[in-house]
Structures are given as C-alpha cells and as structure tokens.
Amino acid sequence: MASNKVVFSVLLLAVVSVLAATATMAEYHHQDQVVYTPAPLCQPGMGYPMYPLPRCRALVKRQCVGRGTAAAAEQVRRDCCRQLAAVDDSWCRCEAISHMLGGIYRELGAPDVGHPMSEVFRGCRRGDLERAAASLPAFCNVDIPNGGGGVCYWLARSGY
C-alpha cells in the first residue's frame, strides 16, 4: 500500500513537472519558432545608455554607403566594438542596437518603419542600414544569446 502511494506521488509529480515545463515553453514559442525576448532591464538608461553606441551609429552609416578611409574606418570599428562589448547583459545588445537604429531614423527625420528599399539618406537604403546594424554582434565578435549566428533576431523577423 505504501509503495503504491510512493509510485502515485512520483507519477503525479512527473505529470505536474511536464505540464509546468510545457506551459513555460509555450510562452517562448510562436509558430514553431523560438521568440527571444530581452530582459526587463534592457531599456535605455538601465541595460544600456540613453544614447547607445554612438560610434556604432557612425560605423553603420559608413557601412551603408561604403565610404571612408581604411584607417578611419578601422578606428570607428574598434570604438564601436568596444562600446557594444561594454553592454554588460548580452541579452540587451540587440535591444541597444535597435534603439540606436531608432535614434538614427529620428536624427534623419525618417519613420521608424518603412520599405527596405526606401532611401534613408543619400546612397543608403533602409534594408542595408538595418542589415549592417543587425550584424554588428557578429562583426564585433560579441555574444548575443539568440543562436542567430551573431545577427540580431529582429532582422529575421523583419523579413529581409
């Protein structure tokens, strides 16, 4: 009798554990894709600076139009990579880059969303700017925990 109670208790515990794990995983899956969400502290002024990654802004703009001397570009790249690595929480890096992109759009008077082929500034299309920004973690060889080969998750979500 006691062994039946033990077996029943173990089975009940196993079922409850599986149900809890399934409910937790369902929160992070959407249409058979894992959805990576940044930590709640990944906000301007908390997980990264209010004006994030100023040297990365310059680098992304340079990459988009393909201009600049090699020496100047190398210094900007080093500075950008240092700033990106300084974002302590690796979960916050893509969020900081996304916020940086929004800042670039505001500075240029462009809407935050638009067609990838639309020109954001002379010689630079929105899609090219966003690809350059999203690939900064891979370019700088800094960790982002989304398993996307160093490319920020929101680029894959945007469809280009």
Swiss-Prot record:
Xref: Gene3D superfamilies: Plant lipid-transfer and hydrophobic proteins (1.10.110.10)
Entry comment on modification after translation: Five disulfide bonds are present.
Subcellular location per the Swiss-Prot or TrEMBL entry: Secreted
Gene Ontology cellular component annotations, sorted alphabetically: extracellular region
Domain of life: Eukaryota
Disulfide bonds: C42-C92, C56-C80, C64-C124, C81-C140, C94-C152
Swiss-Prot/TrEMBL keywords: Allergen, Disulfide bond, Secreted, Seed storage protein, Signal, Storage protein
Stored InterPro entries: Allergen/amylase_inhib_rice (IPR002411), Allergen/soft/tryp_amyl_inhib (IPR006106), Allergen/tryp_amyl_inhib_CS (IPR006105), Bifun_inhib/LTP/seed_sf (IPR036312), Bifunc_inhib/LTP/seed_store (IPR016140)
PROSITE patterns documented for this protein: CEREAL_TRYP_AMYL_INH
Molecular function terms from GO: IgE binding; nutrient reservoir activity; serine-type endopeptidase inhibitor activity
Keyword Signal in record: yes
Main location class: secreted
One protein family per Pfam: Tryp_alpha_amyl
Residues in the signal sequence: 1-26
Function per UniProt: Seed storage protein.
Family: Belongs to the protease inhibitor I6 (cereal trypsin/alpha-amylase inhibitor) family.
Record's protein name: Seed allergenic protein RA5
Organism this protein belongs to: Oryza sativa subsp. japonica (Rice)
Taxonomic path: Eukaryota, Viridiplantae, Streptophyta, Embryophyta, Tracheophyta
